[in-house]
Amino acid sequence: MIKGVQITESTNKNLLNSFWLLDEEKNEARCLVAKGDFQEDQIVAISELGQVSYREVPVNVAPTIKVEGGQHLNVNVLRRETLEDAVKNPEKYPQLTIRVSGYAVRFNSLTPEQQRDVITRTFTESL
């Protein structure tokens, strides 16, 4: 079981008022916030904290995924011809929604210049 603690007494002054997650089953402590010697998310053996007194603090531990060095993939499920037809016949595509800079927008609400720009940027002949 993981418990959250705030260190209230320690021979190491950098540990005073620091917050940790203690996993006694694994004998590990994860730093949440501390001064000086320890970094955020650093995992150390509980024994490395030395002689400390602490008070328990309520912790809501939810599993999280930490991704570093990931990649972004933009998937388009439209064909170029569909967007070109939407430019010529907007009445056929009143609900056509696209993503522009992370925002969802109705394709027909864009200006003709913006529509051409979306088509040009979205569909390229080569990489």
Curated annotation (Swiss-Prot):
The keyword Ubl conjugation is assigned to this record: no
Keywords: Organic radical
A GO CC term attached to the entry: cytosol
Domain Glycine radical: 5-127
Residue ranges of coiled coil: none
GO molecular function: formate C-acetyltransferase activity
PROSITE patterns: GLY_RADICAL_1 (PS00850), GLY_RADICAL_2 (PS51149)
Top-rank taxon, per record: Bacteria
Pfam families to which the protein is assigned, alphabetical: Gly_radical
Keyword Metal-binding included in the entry's annotation: no
Residues recorded with modification Glycine radical: G102
Role according to the record: Acts as a radical domain for damaged PFL and possibly other radical proteins.
Protein name: Autonomous glycyl radical cofactor
Species assigned in the record: Glaesserella parasuis serovar 5 (strain SH0165) (Haemophilus parasuis)
